[in-house]
């Protein structure tokens, strides 16, 4: 178990559709542990494997009781018709957050690190997290879902961000400047 570097916007792995997990072994469980350690260290509420440079369909999240959970090969749906507005950030875009509308509730099904079936019902922040992290597995970043005006502001903020001109698109973000340490 270790804390790894978090990939930043600009790293091609963040725009790649991640591969399904087929082998549930010790190496996979080590990756899940590293995701959890890195997420906690960075003060995030979710972290997907592509954010560590690993193109596999895995993410970790903090549940409503602040416990770390994980989903492998997740599928989302159904989504509630009720929507929620709220500020959303990302460990791969440190220090930035923008208002984004998402469904209030979602059901997520997938597997745990042993290959057993898992179902997670999320509402509020957990729903937002499940949707955000699944987007990462599909090569989608939350800024892709912003309305036109907010996206313009986001692009300006990204260009002005200290990390956007880094020569390497990976940096250890610990703790995340927006969320602080822990939740």
From Swiss-Prot:
Q: Where is the active site?
A: 133
What are the record keywords, sorted?
Answer: Hydrolase, Iron, Metal-binding, Protein biosynthesis
Annotated transmembrane regions:
none
Query: Which SUPFAM superfamilies does the UniProt entry name for this protein?
Result: Peptide deformylase
Explain how, and how many, cofactor molecules are bound.
Binds 1 Fe(2+) ion.
Q: Name one GO biological process term.
A: translation
Annotated GO MF terms: metal ion binding; peptide deformylase activity
Q: What are the EC numbers? A: 3.5.1.88
Requisite cofactors: Fe(2+)
Q: Where does Fe cation bind?
A: 90, 132, 136
Catalytic activity reported:
N-terminal N-formyl-L-methionyl-[peptide] + H2O = N-terminal L-methionyl-[peptide] + formate
Key word Metal-binding present: yes
User: Gene3D superfamilies from the entry?
Assistant: Peptide deformylase (3.90.45.10)
Q: Provide the function of this protein.
A: Removes the formyl group from the N-terminal Met of newly synthesized proteins. Requires at least a dipeptide for an efficient rate of reaction. N-terminal L-methionine is a prerequisite for activity but the enzyme has broad specificity at other positions.
Q: Which NCBIfam families match?
A: pept_deformyl, PRK00150.1-3
Give the PANTHER family listed for this entry. PEPTIDE DEFORMYLASE, PEPTIDE DEFORMYLASE, MITOCHONDRIAL
Q: Which family does it belong to?
A: Belongs to the polypeptide deformylase family.
Name recorded for this polypeptide: Peptide deformylase
């Amino acid at each position: 178990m270790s804390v790894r570097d978090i990939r930043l916007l600009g790293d091609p792995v963040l725009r790649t559709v991640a591969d399904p997990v087929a082998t549930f072994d010790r190496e996979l469980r080590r990756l899940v542990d590293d995701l959890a350690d890195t997420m906690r260290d960075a003060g995030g509420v979710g972290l997907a494997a592509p954010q560590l440079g690993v193109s596999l369909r895995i993410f970790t999240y903090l549940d409503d009781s602040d416990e770390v959970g994980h989903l492998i090969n997740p599928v989302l749906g159904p989504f509630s018709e009720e929507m929620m507005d709220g500020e959303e950030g990302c460990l791969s875009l440190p220090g930035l957050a923008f208002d984004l509308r998402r469904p209030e509730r979602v059901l997520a099904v997938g597997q745990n690190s042993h290959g057993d079936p898992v179902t997670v019902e999320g509402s509020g922040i957990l729903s937002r997290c499940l949707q955000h992290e699944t987007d990462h597995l599909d090569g989608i970043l939350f800024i892709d879902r912003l309305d036109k005006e907010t996206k313009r502001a986001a692009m300006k903020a990204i260009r002005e961000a200290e990390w956007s001109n880094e020569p390497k698109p990976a940096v250890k973000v610990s703790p995340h400047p927006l969320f602080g340490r822990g939740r």
